Regions:
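Helix-loop-helix module between adjacent transmembrane segments
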Residues: 14-19, 39, 50-61, 92-101, ...
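Alpha-helical transmembrane segments of multipass membrane proteins
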Residues: 50-54, 75, 139, 175-183
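Transmembrane helix boundary and interhelical junction motifs in multipass membrane proteins
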Residues: 61-68, 72, 102-108, 188-190
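Hydrophobic alpha-helical transmembrane segments
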Residues: 8-9, 42-50, 64, 87-88, ...
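Short, amphipathic, aromatic/basic-enriched membrane-interface segments that mark the entry/exit
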Residues: 32-41, 156-167, 182-186
Length: 194
């Protein structure tokens, strides 16, 4: 079969979820939170790598890159930092983190649908390699860009972005329901779409 309907439905469901999270301002709020709590350029890179990897494990990595790239550019511009280390961190961490679950990237979705491996078992096998990959990404970027990442404090400009709380609650319930369904062994594709 050239086209696997279950994989396409799973991809569609995860992208719809990411679209609603975007409408709720989840990604903007996350970016602001990361900037507030990272304090330094190196701390920002660490936070960006870990957040990108974590989000990419549960949302499709391509979607995470698309949603976070404009926010990363906005953050580094407001903090007067070079964009390259952070953009590389975003894309590399998204790829590394996405290997942890079936929902992280389309290739894993195909594996998940075709293999019938339980979601929790796949995570048990792949979480450590994903985490180690994220640490390697961080170490390589810190080494490559040691001169471009100054030792100074950074602060966000302006108040936190407004969040659609009602939609955020709905999205949180949807994410929790999807994860429960995945771990319960229900079909990945239809769990994500419902």
């Amino acid at each position: 079969r050239a086209v696997d309907v279950d994989t396409l439905v799973l991809l569609l469901g995860m992208m719809l979820l990411a679209a609603y999270l975007t409408r709720a301002a989840f990604f903007r709020a996350t970016a602001y939170y990361v900037l507030v709590h990272s304090k330094t350029p190196r701390g920002l890179l660490l936070a960006l790598v870990m957040i990108s990897g974590l989000l990419s494990a549960f949302l499709v990595n391509d979607t995470v890159c698309l949603m976070l790239t404009p926010l990363v550019l906005m953050l580094v511009k407001s903090a007067d930092l070079p964009p390259l280390p952070y953009l590389l961190g975003l894309c590399m961490a998204s790829n590394a983190g996405s290997v942890a679950t079936f929902t992280g990237n389309p290739q894993n979705m195909i594996i998940g649908v075709a293999s019938k491996i339980p979601y929790a078992q796949f995570i048990a096998y792949m979480a450590l390699p994903a985490l180690l990959s994220l640490l390697v990404v961080l170490a390589v970027l810190l080494f490559m860009f040691s001169k471009e990442l100054p030792h100074r404090s950074i602060h966000p400009e302006g108040p936190p972005p407004p969040v659609d709380r009602r939609l955020m609650v709905i999205c949180s319930i949807a994410v929790a329901g999807i994860l429960v369904a995945f771990f319960a062994g229900l079909p990945l594709s239809w769990s994500a779409l419902v």
